């Protein structure tokens, strides 16, 4: 006597009695795998294209001289990567190269091309940061791109403040941040100035090499700002004075 299946008499047994359950499971898994492959392919294709820009990105980040043909090929690869998978990370990566190439003085390109690269970088950064706002480096890049395109402004300050709020203790970002702060000081509100002064003072306190503070000074007003930020600490004032004197000897 054949044992009754445990599911018999409950509907599913009658409906599927002629279909082996293993086949059904394989069919479902096959559909799932095909769907997963369909969804994953743009990500994989985008990653493959993005990898083609790795060498140029490394050269940019290590401040090596960029070569125009390599930059153009890398940008084309990143364009394809964004087209295949237009997520925040892809566009932020492309923005980094666009901005770096636009501001690379050694590249033999026109000012019109540099401006076009910067505008595309601005668009990528704004898209990327809208979708992934916790990126202090990208906010600093947006601040510098806006200043390069439009000059000093409140829009530069807005991006700069977001950079500080999202990555306040990232020391490698502070030299360019300080330069942007000094350039755009008149666009900060009174409340924002108090916050910035506190951040600069804290960064001074935590820094082991403070030469970059003096290197950022280009006008007497810049020097006054730094002296104000360091407050009444006589040791800090004396050290800053020595750093300024050494910077002037260069």
Which ranges hold each PLM region?
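Amphipathic alpha-helical repeat scaffolds of TPR domains
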Residues: 44-62, 83-108, 132-145, 171-183, ...
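Hydrophobic membrane-insertion alpha-helices, especially the h-region
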Residues: 22-43
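Polar low-complexity intrinsically disordered regions
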Residues: 3-5, 65, 246-250
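Alpha-helical repeat scaffolds
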Residues: 33-39, 71-81, 113-127, 154-164, ...
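Non-cytosolic head/periplasmic domains of membrane-anchored proteins
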Residues: 109-182, 188
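Terminal, low-structured helical/coil segments at or just beyond the last alpha-helical repeat
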Residues: 184-250
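Terminal alpha-helical segments
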Residues: 41, 61-77, 172
